[in-house]
A protein has these predicted regions:
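An N-terminal, well-structured beta->alpha segment
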Residues: 4-50
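Generic N-terminal leader/processing signal
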Residues: 24, 60, 218-221
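Glycine-rich phosphate-binding loops that contact phosphosugars or nucleotide phosphates
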Residues: 49, 53-182
């Protein structure tokens, strides 16, 4: 251990206490999600499974960052998806939304004006809306076809302000839905390899799908996983 760090005494202990408390709060938030998971999946999964277009994900701020990751995971695991920033959606980008699509709208408060407005627009177009919210009685939840409750007892940082535990639960919910869709569609390693030929994962999936690495995979950058 660095001697200067060890000599900090009280500051060192406060840092470690905050770190452990944050982790415990994140784990507790996932425990709450686990308790209500079956009902959540049974509500949203049929909407996603019936989608014949693309799964469009939207959000703003930290919810938007998480939404981008959810969309990327869906696309790489057999569910075509893309992300639209809610503000851009209200300035023309909603034109990318078509009949047959599903909109996943993420807002922890469920009151973010632009996200709600995009949700309302999608609903008027006949596009099913899945609301991912921390408040199930919010405006966004009320307009939705299905609601995913990602509420947490508190955020993981000391002030209980910065999106931390709530964004973790939201991202995990996206992973859960992607995994459920993979299982329903019998998505295979070969399917994954087709969508992800690059990086270490490309090499790994080539081995799983064909029994041996493909030379084409080695010619693509291995920086990404």
């Amino acid at each position: 251990m660095n001697q200067e760090w060890a000599a900090l005494g009280d500051l060192r202990q406060r840092v470690l206490d905050a770190a452990h408390a944050a982790l415990e709060l994140e784990v507790a938030a996932l425990g709450l999600l686990s308790q209500r998971l079956s009902a959540q999946v049974e509500g949203a999964f049929p909407v996603l499974y019936a989608c014949r277009g693309r799964v469009v994900v939207t959000g703003i701020g930290k919810s938007g960052h998480v939404g981008r990751k959810i969309s990327a995971t869906l696309s790489s695991t057999g569910t075509p998806s893309f992300f639209i920033h809610s503000v851009e959606a209200l300035h023309g980008d909603s034109g990318a939304l078509t009949a047959g699509d599903v909109l996943i709208a993420i807002s922890n408060s469920g009151t973010t004006a632009e996200v709600c407005a995009f949700g309302e627009l999608a609903a008027r177009m006949g596009v099913p809306v899945i609301a991912v919210v921390g408040q199930i009685d919010s405006p966004l939840a009320r307009l939705a076809t299905a609601v995913l409750d990602v509420s947490v007892a508190r955020e993981a940082e000391p002030l209980n302000l910065a999106p931390t535990a709530s964004t973790t639960v939201t991202m995990v919910m996206g992973d859960v839905l992607a995994a459920a869709l993979m299982a329903a569609r019998n998505f295979t390693a070969a399917d994954f390899a087709l969508r992800h030929p690059g990086g270490a994962l490309g090499v790994r999936t080539s081995v799983l799908a064909t029994g041996g690495p493909s030379g084409a995979h080695h010619s693509i950058s291995s920086e990404s996983q």
